[in-house]
Amino acid sequence: MKTTITKLILPLTAAAFVAGCASQGVKNPSGVPVTRMNADEQGFVAGTGVESQDLVAVTDKMVRSILAIPQIAQAATPPIIVLDAVDNHTRFPINKDLFNTRLRSELIKKSGGKVQFLARERMAALEKERNLKREGAVTASSDANVQEFKGADYFLTGTLGGLSTRTKAGTSDYILYEFQLIDARTSTIVWGDNAEIKKQGLEDAAYR
């Protein structure tokens, strides 16, 4: 009986060992592996809405256009710019702040110091720090009672508009990206440019 039990256990142990070895190193065999791509590339997961390659293309065009105008290129001192919110009038619930964020970082990087931006979105933290200095709670390298918060020379803002068509044949979306640089003193639009992108496809995609 002991010999018979041993003969049964050995094959079962070997089978379990082989199964365990076979399962090691197998990663998502039935799925599609993740592919790392550049932000300006279009992948196989795509829709007719605003995507990363659109954001890169549009903001790159706007940066080149802004830096070429006389108010920036020929300014005696670097103009100070404040970002105003981008209005989204398309059907896509996108993070519209990404446009301003990339515009600002690319302008700072490529302008060679010809433009400056104010961190108005951080005003609460800045005012708190200023008050702490005025109260003597923290050190100050200059007179904390002097008003040093700067005003803007220009506001940079934009609008996204769209037209959509949907039939049994598929979906089509046209998006107009328009941006403006507005003189903060006179309200004059000193610069404006736009980009147009149209896409069509068989299926619609969900955007978050």
Where are the regions that the model predicts?
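Solvent-exposed, acidic/flexible segments
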Residues: 48-59, 92-100, 139, 168-172
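Bacterial Sec signal peptide processing site at the extreme N-terminus
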Residues: 15-40, 44-45, 207-208
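N-terminal segment of the mature soluble domain
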Residues: 60-61, 65-138, 186-192
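Amphipathic beta-strand/beta-sheet edge segments enriched in Tyr/Trp
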Residues: 22-31, 153-201, 205
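Acidic/histidine-rich, surface-exposed loop or edge segments in extracytoplasmic proteins
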Residues: 36-50, 79-89
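A short, hydrophobic beta-strand-centered structural micro-motif
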Residues: 61-66, 80-85, 137-166
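Sec-dependent bacterial lipoprotein signal peptides
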Residues: 1-21
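Surface-exposed acidic, glycine-flexible loop patches that form ligand/cofactor-binding
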Residues: 70-75, 146, 167-169
